[in-house]
Amino acid sequence: MNVYEGSLVATGLKVGLVVARFNSLVTEQLLVGAADALRRHGVKDGDIDVFRCPGTFELPALLRRVARSARYDAVVALGAVIRGGTPHFEYVAGEATKGVAQIALESDCAVSMGILTCDTLEQALERAGVKAGNKGAEAAVAAVEQANVLREAAKVPSPRRAE
């Protein structure tokens, strides 16, 4: 049995962070956590690019463009959707999640999702580093691991076909 896993060493990786500006109190903390995690795992500052879009709904379109640029080993989506009194939350959260998932399937680079979907601002802040760790950092580390396992998978030889 052959087992392929991605390492958490990010030296030499180029990463695009795509960040929604809406709910910036939360998303800026996700960005800080993601960038810090990337640096701690070996990514140089010059190999981290940050792209900003208006909100989480718009995030997949920019994420797709960045992922398709072929300049990055990994891209990370960072956003926050906080429930309000209307069904708007479900639409934005659902479509953003579907969009990121579709990009992950279509892309040759690693795609990671650090989009918070929370009932309250307090929950979002907790997940952005106040209490429950930083989900931006977790998404960045997942992107590193995925980028490395994708590299390993690309090296696996094709099976020989019986003639």
Curated annotation (Swiss-Prot):
Its EC number is 2.5.1.78. GO terms for biological process: riboflavin biosynthetic process. It is an enzyme of class 2 (transferase). One of its GO terms (cellular component) is riboflavin synthase complex. It catalyses: (2S)-2-hydroxy-3-oxobutyl phosphate + 5-amino-6-(D-ribitylamino)uracil = 6,7-dimethyl-8-(1-D-ribityl)lumazine + phosphate + 2 H2O + H(+). (2S)-2-hydroxy-3-oxobutyl phosphate binds at G85, T86, R127. The keyword Hydrolase does not apply. One of its GO terms (molecular function) is 6,7-dimethyl-8-ribityllumazine synthase activity. 5-amino-6-(D-ribitylamino)uracil binds at F22, T56, F57, E58, A80, V81, I82, M113. Pathway: Cofactor biosynthesis; riboflavin biosynthesis; riboflavin from 2-hydroxy-3-oxobutyl phosphate and 5-amino-6-(D-ribitylamino)uracil: step 1/2. Keywords: Riboflavin biosynthesis, Transferase. It holds the Pfam family DMRL_synthase. The active site is at H88. InterPro entries: LS (IPR034964), LS/RS (IPR002180), LS/RS_sf (IPR036467). Belongs to the DMRL synthase family. NCBIfam families: lumazine-synth, PRK00061.1-4. Catalyzes the formation of 6,7-dimethyl-8-ribityllumazine by condensation of 5-amino-6-(D-ribitylamino)uracil with 3,4-dihydroxy-2-butanone 4-phosphate. This is the penultimate step in the biosynthesis of riboflavin. This is 6,7-dimethyl-8-ribityllumazine synthase. It comes from Anaeromyxobacter sp. (strain Fw109-5).
